Regions:
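Alpha-helical residues within the helix-turn-helix
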Residues: 10, 21, 50
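DNA major-groove recognition helix of helix-turn-helix/homeodomain DNA-binding modules
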Residues: 43-58
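A short, Lys/Arg-rich alpha-helix, primarily the initiator
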Residues: 1-11
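Short, conserved catalytic or interaction motifs in soluble domains
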Residues: 35, 54, 64
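Short alpha-helical DNA-recognition segment
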Residues: 14-32
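Short, charged recognition helix plus adjacent turn
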Residues: 50, 60-74
Length: 74
């Protein structure tokens, strides 16, 4: 799963530590998410998106991009 957490975090002039405080997690978790080492829970993804003031689908995407979701049945 690709993500743009670092991009939006830097645009908001937030450190990893500050974003972690606002989102309710650790700085290490934000770092691991940014590096793609950890896929956040839905709850954590929503918390991060809220603090960065972006839609969660703009923050996280499947490897093929948004078009890849077209084949998923709900």
């Amino acid at each position: 799963m690709k993500n743009r957490v670092k991009l939006f975090r830097v645009m908001k002039n937030l450190s990893q530590r500050r974003l972690a405080e606002l989102a309710g997690c650790s700085q290490q978790e934000i770092s691991a998410i940014e590096k793609g080492e950890v896929i956040p829970t839905v709850y954590m993804a929503l918390c991060i998106a809220r603090q960065l003031e972006v839609k969660v689908e703009d923050l996280f995407m499947l490897e093929g991009g948004k078009d890849e979701r077209a084949g998923i049945l709900y």
